[in-house]
Every structure is written in structure tokens, then in C-alpha cells.
Amino acid sequence: MTLSTENHTPFNQVHPNGSQQEATTENTSIPTQQEARILKSVSDLCAGKLKFKDLDKEIKNPFDAVLIRRAFLLVQCQGMNVRDTFSSDLPFENYDYSDVMETCCENAFGYIPVPVGLAGQLNVDGTTVYLPLATTEGALVASVSRGCKAINMSGGATTAITSDAMTRAPCLRLPSLSRAVEAKRWIESSEGFKALQDTFRQSSNHCRLIGVSVHVVGNHIYPRFQASTGDAMGMNMITHSIRNSISMMQNRFNDLEIISLSGNLCADKKPAAVNWVEGRGKGVIAQCRLSSVTMSNLLKTDAKQLAGLNTMKNHVGSAMAGASGGFNAQASNIVTAMYLATGQDVAQNVESSQCITTMEE
């Protein structure tokens, strides 16, 4: 298939299997209808007749849209070293792009396969579970499995959920400080809180407002809403409920202006003291008691050495680094690998891995 256009010179197309085919302007065979459509779309993209963002709407076949983007990228990157890296070696076949287009990924032109390792088994609250870990970091799965074995040998782990509230904090502006304080007092009053709770209940079958604290900065307010979201992470439902709540508030405060539905006091996907102190999402505590036999035979250490290491590394070392919630060894490694394997928002590992490891001899 020729990937050159009337506006661009020929180039070598490098295929995922490593072979190269010389693309020329001379037609050695009559292109298929699919190839003709792809070539015309690439030409239209290069000429500005077709907008990149409209490709999915114009091309009804999701896989054809992927081929067009890959061909377009090859044309645009002629002579650049990035060509082979970003297109030719990127897998794209054997994937159902209809599941992601206009849903969770724009401008798709391939996918990244990540190996998934199985860690465990692990005994948690009397139940045996396995941990799927998607990673390219050697020894991570083996390390986690070793930890699981140590916990199992000592009777398993017990857990407790201590808090359960997703948060979102919009930034709202009022014309003066006095109006901002008035809005704060109303939101935190029993009347205001009940009105907000009712709006949340009407907006979602699962999202329930359980608390709100309002921070005033000049004539701006940052109400930090806390809501239970059932088994879902819940960012969409809480954001939708807050949008409706603000509309309700504007009936009372007609000078209230939305600056942003997320004012960064949430705090979403960023290391923040407010998450460390007040929590965000589900707060979980896990506990296990390692036997001396396990520490000696499996971990090759003893309680005194292990507790001392935890103090000097995870507590003192982290404090010297100015860590915010990073008083652990590698929580983010495990959380990120599990999120990748289970299709969660990987960027949420920031607040999800904020934790402290404590040990007592």
C-alpha cells in the first residue's frame, strides 16, 4: 500500500514485524477500496480539508481511523527519528477500538501491551485473594509474592475501612468578601446543608453528600464536598451532583460565579496535605503479626532489625525528604500495577498510595 500523497515525497513504511517496504508514487497494483479511502483521508488531513478531531465521525470504521492516523503520522514525521518509535513499532491490530473511541481515548492509533503478573495468594480477613500486577519492573511481582507468603505464614492480614468519602472542591467567586462569607455560612448551616443533600440525592442514585467544609480566599470560596459513592470511585457522579448543587445555590446567590468545578482543593491526582490529614476516598488500615519463625526463615531478619529499618527508612528518611504521605517503602509500585491491571485511573495512585507503615517489636 502506497502511503505517499500528492503533497509529500515517498518514504519507507516500517512494519511492526520489523520488515520494510519501499513506498513509491508508482502504482504496482490497483489499491483496494479500503486503501483508496485511507489514502484520500490522509491526503485530506495533510491538506487541511479534514480535521483530525473529526476523523472518528467521518470514518465509520474505527480500525480504518486507526490506520489513517498511523499513515498520517508517518507522512508528517518523514526524516524524524520519532517516526519509528511512535508509529511503526506500536501495536495496533487485534484490538476493538469501538470500545474506546469517543469514550475513553481520543485519536487512538495503537495500544501498549503491558505484561500482567500474578502475586499471591494472600489471606485477607479470612478470604484468599490474588493480586494482578501489570508492570515492567523486574522483581516487583516476586517481591510482593514474598510479602504475601510472609503474611500467610503468620496467619493472614486483617483490615478495616475507617473513612469513605470522595471529595471535589469547586472554585466559586462572589463580588465581595462579605458575600463570600455569607455563602460560606449558608452552605455550612443546617438549612444549606440539607438543601445540598437533597440536590445530591436528586442528581444520583448512589452519590450521597456526607460533609462539606468551605474555605474562603478573598472573595472566592472553595467548598470541599465529601460524598459516599458506593463501590465506584465516583468522580463523575460527584462532579455532576456538584454542578447541580451550584445551580441550586445560584438561585439564592445570583451573583455566584463558577470559576472551576475543580479548584484543586479536592485534591485530585496531586500530593496534598489535605488528603493526608482528612483523607480522600476510602481510608483503609491493614494489620498483620509476623512470627519470629517467618522473619527468620523467609525474610532472613528479626523483629528488632525490621522495626529499626522501618523507623530509619520509612519514617526518618521520608521526613528528611519532606514527604507528604510517603512514609512507606513502595506502596505506589503496587497500587499503580494493580490499577493498570484492572483498568483504573493510574494517576490516582498519587493519593491512593499515601500511607504510613508502622512496626512494633
Question: Model features per residue range: what roles?
Answer:
Residues 108, 115, 124, 145, ...:
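Short glycine/serine/threonine-biased micro-segments
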Residues 110-113, 117-218, 223-226:
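Small-residue-rich
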